[in-house]
């Protein structure tokens, strides 16, 4: 009888394989329908369908299966920590050709002066949903699917802080200076090799100097008649965060599906920039590079394109997303770069 880990592995691999092939088949079939309508020929339709089957078979045999073999058997990519080979292969082998076919469909219909199919509902949604599913599988693969969440980050995950006590705390360095001792020489952190993550290091070390400030003590509240509402699971948060992470790109692709935009030249830069933003899925979720890549590949380019679309086509995109791109870009530049300036790096300001 198969073990739970084996069943989990089989389910994950089948799901990722389905996400690899199904979007290609659906998009190519819709494109074949456009070709049949333009050329009035069933032969062209079946040629496109056959090409999609041949492409999926070739990619599976020569790229996808060898990649999975190297990852699962030889552990060739076991030391890769900042990027994910599976998601990189997916966005190249599945998402890229799907976006290219959608752009080609727009071009074919625009040249033929017809408006047959904008591929807005099922094809585009399926491509983005498959990408999100692959991302979720890669993120949830190390976690258990049954029982309580395990692991250091999951065990230390706080369902929600509750302010239970407030008091004035004098810093450790202040006590040492009062006794004529050097705080930096006497107190040192017991963690020297970075074995603890940054967000928990302050809670587990005692030698970190702090200024005199209010100390907030937190506790978990599980009692009372509404204790059943005080629940949270990191695995559920993973699903929600994965969808929320791509909402901006989803909205940009939705704008490309409107009649006025899809049959114009603006569909090219929109889908190209949307694909560049999708490349962020290659970076691991906890990588420091993710924040900068989000600004450079999504917020700044999307801001420029949305302002141009607003000027050319009117309110085809909500102003809310423009404000989001502006605030995300400004806050990143300010907190990451400008706060390091001497003028803004003073403890007495704000």
Curated annotation (Swiss-Prot):
Transmembrane domains' residue ranges: 9-29, 47-67, 85-105, 120-140, 259-279, 302-322, 325-345
GO cellular component: membrane
Location(s) in or outside the cell: Membrane
Keyword Endoplasmic reticulum: no
Keywords from the named record: Membrane, Transmembrane, Transmembrane helix
Membrane topology: Multi-pass membrane protein
InterPro entries documented for this protein: Uncharacterised_FAM23-like_TM (IPR020394)
Protein name: Transmembrane protein 236
Native source organism of the sequence: Danio rerio (Zebrafish)
Gene: tmem236
